[in-house]
């Protein structure tokens, strides 16, 4: 008991306008005060600490749930993206195959068109050569005919007499008359 009264007496000796601080001497502090302070801290701190821990626990659980939901959404999106990628790869393969076959088809079409053009040019060349040959043959024939006609006329003129002329004219008139009768 003496300690209790000594502590009250010592309170009177403390300066009121002095500094505030912790008394680190455990023997000089009042155990009752310490137990009251600790009891109050435990009583009120327990609820606050429990609320803090519950709030933290709820935040952790909600974060875990959110991350699980986000993971599920990410997995779904990944599967959709993989499906789209497979589809695009299939389409790309089809385009590639179709493109190669289209290129091959166009190549053969071009080769065939080139052969057809060459064949047409060859035919045109042959027709042109044939035409030029026919023209040359016709020119030669005309010259030969003209020369033969001139030779025949020259021979006729040199050997002709008036009686021969009269017979030729009569024969020609007879032929013209016969032709006229046929046409009428």
Curated annotation (Swiss-Prot):
InterPro entries: ATP_synth_b/b'su_bac/chlpt (IPR002146). It comes from the Eukaryota. It is found in: Plastid, Chloroplast thylakoid membrane. Keywords: ATP synthesis, CF(0), Chloroplast, Hydrogen ion transport, Ion transport, Membrane, Plastid, Thylakoid, Transmembrane, Transmembrane helix, Transport. It holds the Pfam family ATP-synt_B. HAMAP family: ATP_synth_b_bprime. F(1)F(0) ATP synthase produces ATP from ADP in the presence of a proton or sodium gradient. F-type ATPases consist of two structural domains, F(1) containing the extramembraneous catalytic core and F(0) containing the membrane proton channel, linked together by a central stalk and a peripheral stalk. During catalysis, ATP synthesis in the catalytic domain of F(1) is coupled via a rotary mechanism of the central stalk subunits to proton translocation. Component of the F(0) channel, it forms part of the peripheral stalk, linking F(1) to F(0). Belongs to the ATPase B chain family. This is ATP synthase subunit b, chloroplastic. It comes from Calycanthus floridus var. glaucus. The gene is atpF.
């Amino acid at each position: 008991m003496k300690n209790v009264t000594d502590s009250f007496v010592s309170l009177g000796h403390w300066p009121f306008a002095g500094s505030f601080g912790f008394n680190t001497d455990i023997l000089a502090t009042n155990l009752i005060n310490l137990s009251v302070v600790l009891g109050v801290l435990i009583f009120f701190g327990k609820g606050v600490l429990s609320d803090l821990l519950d709030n933290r626990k709820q935040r952790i659980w909600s974060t875990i749930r959110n991350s699980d939901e986000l993971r599920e959404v990410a997995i779904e999106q990944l599967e959709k993206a993989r499906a789209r990628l497979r589809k695009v790869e299939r389409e790309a393969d089809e385009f590639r195959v179709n493109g190669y076959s289209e290129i091959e088809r166009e190549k053969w079409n071009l080769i065939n068109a080139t052969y057809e053009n060459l064949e047409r040019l060859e035919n045109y060349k042959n027709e042109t050569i044939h035409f030029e040959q026919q023209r040359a043959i016709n020119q030669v024939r005309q010259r030969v005919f003209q020369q033969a006609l001139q030779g025949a006329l020259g021979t006729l003129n040199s050997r002709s007499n008036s009686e021969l002329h009269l017979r030729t004219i009569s024969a020609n008139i007879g032929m013209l008359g016969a032709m006229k009768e046929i046409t009428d």
